[in-house]
């Protein structure tokens, strides 16, 4: 009205609307300018998903999914903000300017600096002469819905730019772009407080609400803007083990090199395969299922000698048993006697063994049955070698 008091109007933020355009441009740029092969690949984006009545290409599928989740987040943020405003019912700082109460009709003197007058609670429905819609909006201040929507929009967009785009050559491009996206939301909060439309606590609560919803959707719903791995049945532990990379053993390579050509193709399998359920004893334990990487029974590889450690003593070879001499009727001229050549038969038997220690060992084991040695074994422990010989 001319010459009258200016009318207050409700303000709306259009920042959330620009996010649709930003995500659309980002997906189009990603479709026409794909990432180089050296970049981290995205699983499952090369498959065209076909539904009951239509087919979705990977760029269209990503665009619909990201924008759909963003729209769902906008509705969720609006519901949370409206619920908080209705429950709390805190008035805005400019509530009296919007309400325009008629103090004369209400029987209340208008407040003045000289005479503030007593406080009085007014519950009359017609106490406000302003626009009913503006009055209803001025009664709901906490949390600030505009701040919540702006915070949600810029947080979603900043995370999209950070997680999707790959920029080479400079590390400040993405941080600068994210800060440029966060500035409008901050300015909206400052304007709401400067124009006395909201308190600073209302704006802060709106920022926290919008940022929390955006972070939850990006992290748990769209999985950081990456595609899910192809869904399927859960692999068993044995199938998971069979798909794991294997490492060839040097002993297996040596066995393959020593095997004939006909058996070499079966000796070393490419990967471990689950065998039939059986009971296997391994270090004193029973294992119900065993995974074997051995070759078939038709092809056997030679054993590779185990390298001996330096600390292990080398076993001495056992002497071969000597045949028992044939019983003789008398002293033969070829066998030496007790005093030299031509001696008794017992002296000839003693010369068959080189040392007294081996002679007594054979006597104990029964391989050299001689009455002379059985009788003289006990004195050997206490006598010298010259005395026994």
Swiss-Prot record:
It is a multi-pass membrane protein. GO terms for cellular component: plasma membrane. Pfam families: PAP2. Residues 265-278 have a biased composition (Polar residues). It is found in: Membrane. Residues 255-280, 295-351 are annotated as: Disordered. Glycans are attached at residue 102. InterPro entries: P_Acid_Pase_2/haloperoxi_sf, P_Acid_Pase_2/haloperoxidase, PA_PP_rel. Residues 314-339 have a biased composition (Pro residues). Keywords: Glycoprotein, Membrane, Phosphoprotein, Transmembrane, Transmembrane helix. The keyword Transmembrane applies. The modification Phosphoserine is found at residues 236, 249. The chain crosses the membrane at residues 14-34, 66-86, 147-167, 176-196, 203-223. GO terms for molecular function: phosphatidate phosphatase activity. Belongs to the PA-phosphatase related phosphoesterase family. This is Phospholipid phosphatase-related protein type 2. It comes from Bos taurus.
């Amino acid at each position: 009205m001319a010459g009258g008091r200016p009318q207050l109007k409700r303000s709306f933020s259009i920042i959330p609307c620009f996010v649709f355009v930003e995500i659309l441009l980002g997906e189009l740029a990603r479709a026409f300018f794909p990432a180089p092969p050296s970049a981290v690949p995205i699983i499952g984006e090369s498959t065209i998903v076909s539904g009951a009545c239509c087919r979705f290409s990977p760029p269209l599928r990503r665009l619909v999914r990201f924008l759909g989740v963003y729209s769902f987040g906008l509705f969720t943020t609006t519901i949370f903000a409206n619920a908080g405003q209705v429950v709390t019912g805190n008035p805005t700082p400019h509530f009296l300017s919007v309400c325009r109460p008629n103090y004369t009709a209400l029987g209340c003197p208008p407040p003045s600096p000289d005479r503030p007058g007593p406080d009085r609670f007014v519950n009359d429905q017609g106490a406000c002469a302003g626009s009913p819609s503006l009055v209803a909006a001025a009664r709901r201040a906490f949390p600030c819905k505009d701040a919540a929507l702006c915070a949600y929009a810029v947080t979603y967009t900043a995370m999209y730019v950070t997680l999707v785009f790959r920029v080479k050559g400079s590390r400040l491009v993405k941080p600068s772009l994210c800060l440029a996206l966060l500035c409008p939301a901050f300015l909206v909060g400052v304007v709401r407080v400067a124009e006395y439309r909201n308190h600073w606590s209302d704006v802060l609560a709106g920022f926290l609400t919008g940022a929390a919803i955006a972070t939850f959707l990006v992290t748990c719903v769209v999985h950081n803007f990456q595609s899910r791995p192809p869904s399927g049945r859960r692999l068993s532990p044995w199938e998971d083990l069979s798909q794991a990379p294997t490492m060839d053993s040097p002993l297996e390579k040596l066995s393959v090199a020593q095997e004939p050509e006909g058996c070499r193709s079966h000796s070393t399998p490419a990967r471990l395969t689950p065998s039939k359920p059986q009971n296997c004893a391994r270090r004193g334990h029973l294992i119900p299922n065993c995974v074997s990487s051995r070759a078939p029974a038709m092809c056997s590889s030679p054993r590779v000698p185990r390298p001996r450690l330096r600390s292990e003593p080398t076993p001495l070879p056992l002497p071969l048993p000597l045949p028992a001499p044939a019983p003789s009727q008398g002293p033969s001229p070829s066998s030496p006697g007790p005093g030299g050549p031509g001696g008794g038969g017992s002296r000839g038997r003693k010369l068959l063994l080189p040392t007294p220690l081996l002679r007594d060992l054979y006597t104990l084991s029964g391989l050299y049955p001689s009455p002379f040695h059985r009788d003289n074994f006990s004195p050997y422990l206490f006598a010298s070698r010259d005395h026994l010989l």
